[in-house]
């Protein structure tokens, strides 16, 4: 479906911005009390730079609505599905923790909508807003480099890695995963993700997973036809790890029906939050 709407929603991965700012800059403290503020400063600089650059975009690419989406606690509903989900992650740095609230206040000071919801990840909120926009044929650009969000890319939804000034559309997703966005979930389910402690099928990487999905069409079809796969080792590992693959699919699939209470109603022209 062609994009017939004049609206263009930009969904900013706020948590991604925070950690990029934290690790990219040397420690910085407030002179008056020693409060760590390096991530706050870096986040604000990144957001301001992005807002300024977005003003110079062509009209078709210029955002009409903004929202910054945050994670909340480390644990969420995925830990109920698989208790080891992200269990390998290091604890949040102590000097970063007190900066979270100031970053949220900074977003408010920019008069941009900040959204978070307990028990869900930022990616799920982004997926939900993207789904709502798609139903209204509204163009969406997701400001993030997170590969887990690439399953959302389609004709009206794009990604932008502002740190690398890299545009991510359907072809860029295919270049990375070997499949188009609508099959990314299936590839991730087979390959797993060590950074999130998602098991996948042992010995199956992105390249092999893409070959299998391109051959059979879906994760379920791969598992149904596992016994017919010619390579003995690959055949056996698929037969032995069906449950892991199916659990992995539940983990990598972003929820598109999160009960968000805040509408996307931030005016780009006035940078002012308002209710619709």
Label every model-predicted segment.
Residues 115-116, 180-185, 234-235, 261-264:
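Short, surface-exposed acidic
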